[in-house]
């Protein structure tokens, strides 16, 4: 079975046209990280430039500035790398071209495999790979397994992954390089999951420990819906419980989650 982890960095913004408003991502760096059980991982890294026309840039100027400073550290006007792929000057065409190139590379990597698991962690990548309809492939979002953010994984254990892993396009020490992120997520996958019937599974937190955790959060958090004893708050309480597990990287399966809801009479 081939496992493929995809991470895309770029400039995300609003595009206005005759079809209405679209949120699109113009890629600057794409990493396809793939491996099979008991084999070494491989990495395909792609860089892109261009594809942001003046209107798209003007509309999203503030957002692009924030993304550049605080997320991926790519500059709109930087010189492209020698191996960088030029995107069409029209933004919509650039968006389509970037997706097409990623699709073509995925097909090339996966074509000789009968069982494929395409992995992503949130972001637009999930929507993209689902739309590709790669033969023999299942798409899975690591967020559904309550995978912590890369930042939390690195903060929790300083030597989780060497900070030297990455590429020169990002500020040294930044956790936003797709190469670095994929190495961190790969390590988390190896340590916390197993493959069951073609998808990743993670052991659920036992019911007793899950209840103790929620009781602790209720006592520790000042603002939560359990302070109001009203049936109208039930959905908010259920959402709050689920969010607590996700935010703390704890996976609780639906059966145990349902038992916790029953304990608090959240019918």
Swiss-Prot record:
**Induction conditions:** Expressed in the early phase of the viral replicative cycle.
UniProt record, GO biological process: symbiont-mediated suppression of host cytoplasmic pattern recognition receptor signaling pathway via inhibition of RIG-I activity
Organism domain of life: Viruses
Q: Which UniProt keywords apply?
A: Early protein, Host-virus interaction, Inhibition of host innate immune response by virus, Inhibition of host RIG-I by virus, Inhibition of host RLR pathway by virus, Viral immunoevasion
Family assignment?
Belongs to the asfivirus I267L family.
This protein is called what? Protein I267L
Protein's organism: African swine fever virus (isolate Tick/South Africa/Pretoriuskop Pr4/1996) (ASFV)
Ranked from the top, the taxonomy reads: Viruses, Varidnaviria, Bamfordvirae, Nucleocytoviricota, Pokkesviricetes
């Amino acid at each position: 079975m081939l496992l493929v982890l995809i991470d895309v960095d770029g400039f995300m913004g609003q595009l206005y046209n005759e079809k209405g408003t679209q949120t699109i991502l113009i890629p600057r760096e794409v990493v396809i990280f793939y491996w099979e059980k008991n084999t070494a991982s491989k990495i395909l890294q792609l860089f892109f430039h261009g594809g942001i026309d003046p209107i798209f840039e003007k509309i999203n100027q503030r957002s692009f500035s924030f993304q550049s400073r605080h997320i991926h550290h790519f500059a709109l006007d930087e010189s492209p790398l020698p191996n960088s792929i030029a995107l069409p000057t029209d933004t919509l065409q650039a968006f389509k071209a970037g997706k097409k190139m990623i699709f073509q590379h995925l097909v090339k990597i996966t074509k000789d495999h009968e069982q494929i698991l395409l992995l992503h962690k949130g972001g637009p990548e999930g929507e993209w790979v689902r739309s590709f309809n790669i033969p023999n492939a299942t798409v899975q979002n690591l967020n559904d397994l309550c995978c912590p953010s890369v930042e939390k994984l690195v903060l929790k254990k300083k030597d989780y992954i060497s900070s030297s892993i990455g590429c020169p396009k990002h500020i040294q020490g930044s956790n936003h390089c797709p190469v670095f992120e994929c190495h961190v997520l790969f390590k988390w996958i190896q340590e916390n999951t197993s493959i069951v019937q073609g998808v990743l599974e993670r052991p659920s937190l036992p019911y007793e420990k899950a209840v103790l955790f929620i009781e602790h959060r209720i006592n520790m958090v000042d603002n939560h819906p359990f302070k109001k004893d009203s049936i109208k708050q039930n959905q908010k309480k259920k959402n709050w419980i689920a969010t607590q597990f996700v935010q703390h990287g704890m996976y609780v399966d639906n059966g145990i989650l349902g038992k916790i809801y029953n304990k608090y009479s959240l019918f």
